[in-house]
Amino acid sequence: MHNNGRMLGVIGGSGFYTFFGSDTRTVNSDTPYGQPSAPITIGTIGVHDVAFLPRHGAHHQYSAHAVPYRANMWALRALGVRRVFGPCAVGSLDPELEPGAVVVPDQLVDRTSGRADTYFDFGGVHAAFADPYCPTLRAAVTGLPGVVDGGTMVVIQGPRFSTRAESQWFAAAGCNLVNMTGYPEAVLARELELCYAAIALVTDVDAGVAAGDGVKAADVFAAFGENIELLKRLVRAAIDRVADERTCTHCQHHAGVPLPFELP
């Protein structure tokens, strides 16, 4: 493995529990916020060392509202990760975005409640979040064939799916995708000055958009399973397009602000 101090991170979503073949090592991490969802596996993709963490645990132990998001992001940064891809499953609120589509959102709407979504409970630290995703990492994915560039992802609390009225409300507000894990993952990355981009795989058309019985968990997992190898190939291809040196300044915004503690 390379040891260039420029490790990338990948946080796998539902059904995305492994990423590498052989030649890996596993790191058991502990953080001020507890342990992450699973041990972190480190392998190599092209010229990059990559740290992989399954968001929901190795066996999907954590539902979306219960994922230890703060521990996950802290553990990755403590390993030296500064750039993170977050593949995830999403429902479509746009009839033109059909199951199997891969979308790289550029905006986010938070409709969660009660999640631990900051490291800075004390001190005057306020994350710049107007553009929640790293433009440099987004470009690494949107430059790939067949990927949809842009869209607004609304993040709901879960673990239940949306009602028809909620889906129609989200769509009328201009949201294109609905998901359960994109927040607080994105804002915690920003607080830790990590570059972060979501890679959203559409698994279903949401209840308020399509006729029928609505979204069922079994159908979501089945659709993700059918497309998981495609998604992994896209993530690997995106990693190959990431520069060796981190050049993005968009996600580094704490300069001149006294932090209540040192970042790992």
From Swiss-Prot:
The keyword Transferase applies. The keyword Transferase applies. Pfam families: PNP_UDP_1. Not inhibited by adenosine, potently inhibited by MT-DADMe-immucillin A. The record marks S162, A217 as: Important for substrate specificity. GO terms for cellular component: cytosol. Its EC number is 2.4.2.28. GO terms for molecular function: S-methyl-5-thioadenosine phosphorylase activity. InterPro entries: MTAP, Nucleoside_phosphorylase_d, Nucleoside_phosphorylase_sf. It is an enzyme of class 2 (transferase). Phosphate binds at S14, R55, H56, T181. Substrate binds at M180, D204, V205, D206. It catalyses: S-methyl-5'-thioadenosine + phosphate = 5-(methylsulfanyl)-alpha-D-ribose 1-phosphate + adenine. Catalyzes the reversible phosphorylation of S-methyl-5'-thioadenosine (MTA) to adenine and 5-methylthioribose-1-phosphate. Involved in the breakdown of MTA, a major by-product of polyamine biosynthesis. Responsible for the first step in the methionine salvage pathway after MTA has been generated from S-adenosylmethionine. Prefers MTA, with 2% activity on adenosine, 0.8% activity on S-adenosyl-L-homocysteine and no activity on other tested nucleosides. Belongs to the PNP/MTAP phosphorylase family. MTAP subfamily. Homodimer. This is S-methyl-5'-thioadenosine phosphorylase.
